[in-house]
């Protein structure tokens, strides 16, 4: 178990070094300098844009290339805006900041510029933990530069786990020590043990609402060796792995907040930070909030670690939800696409990323690079235990449904899982309905096209079965 140790705030420590290291910054500047002054436009949420400003301004000073205008909309709504731009083949926006799961759809629409040639010329490579750097690739090409390393981390209340009375009661009841959960049944047993609404403690802080809950379901499915489709694009959710995943998904209701079917992150996060939750899997950025004593009542009261595992072929299998991987993509219809590509590379450098990641006010960017895992500033923002947990989970990060039509497939999951969770569909009907609805989407988009997409989807799954 890794402890979430409360640490002092950064105070006056400078987060940005004015000159980037020669091996990653100078080559990008050299590649971009000949382009000249360029004003770029982006579709991006301001919550992400604000902490990006200092490195953006540094690049603009060095090259004359800057992002001078953004269309400010939230990241969950950007896919619709991006597809609208793609359908009109508009060159208005140069960069879009969105979840990498949209890459297959946007490539299929002819909207995205491959970035490998720009990266090679700029001597730039994403130095990601594990296989995380594969998640913005498609058909062997790189289409996105990571800026936000979203990954699920297991959180459990340290004070509850280390309480002597709790330890004795748990061992007396279950005949085993109160310990870090190795699998989903271990975690559910732990959540039920701590669940006590009368005292203001709910066992689970996991989300089950539309737009969020499906992420947990996919993680459970992957952890039992499941996959939404076979290579011929036949839906395969209604399988033993799917049944295991659905059981875990639905039983959470026993230890959840009564309003959880309608809660998103903005509703759940305050309850977690206030100490009203015993355990959950959540995006790593929450650690920065929980460990900030100025914003959290529970700083120093959390343990962070690897999410529980499932089982496939008789062996344990760990899969952590790496969704959405938020990336910068470049509009291939833009006359400024080269300038946009080099700006994206610059913002993906270690020095730019570490500044965004260690921002204690704007906490949307999360650590994802190898050097960040040993950077003292990152440890100060997340706690040493938090960083170790992020690294472990990044090593087994699994993607969203990485196919053309992602939003349609996600809508199918949202609808059926939601109806199952509130009792409008019987559990036995949920998986059958998902497979039937998936088959309709496959037919509408085209089986031949999706069979090609499937190859990339399967290829970007993590190779490790557990963290190193």
Say what each PLM segment does.
Residues 70, 262, 384-442:
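C-terminal capping/gating helix-and-loop segments adjacent to ligand/active sites or protein-protein/ligand interfaces
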Residues 285-298, 311-415, 450, 454-468:
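C-terminal lobe and pocket-closing loops
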Residues 139-148, 152, 179-235, 241, ...:
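Extracytoplasmic/periplasmic solute-binding protein
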Residues 186-195, 231-265, 307-310:
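Glycine-centered hinge/linker elements that transmit conformational signals in sensory
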Residues 1-20:
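N-terminal export signals
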Residues 84, 91-94, 122-161, 313-321, ...:
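A structural signal for short loop-to-beta-strand junctions that line the ligand-binding cleft
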Residues 22-34, 100-153, 188, 216, ...:
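Hinge/lid segment of periplasmic solute-binding proteins
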Residues 58-129, 141-144, 164-165, 278-279, ...:
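Extracytoplasmic "Venus flytrap"/periplasmic binding protein-like
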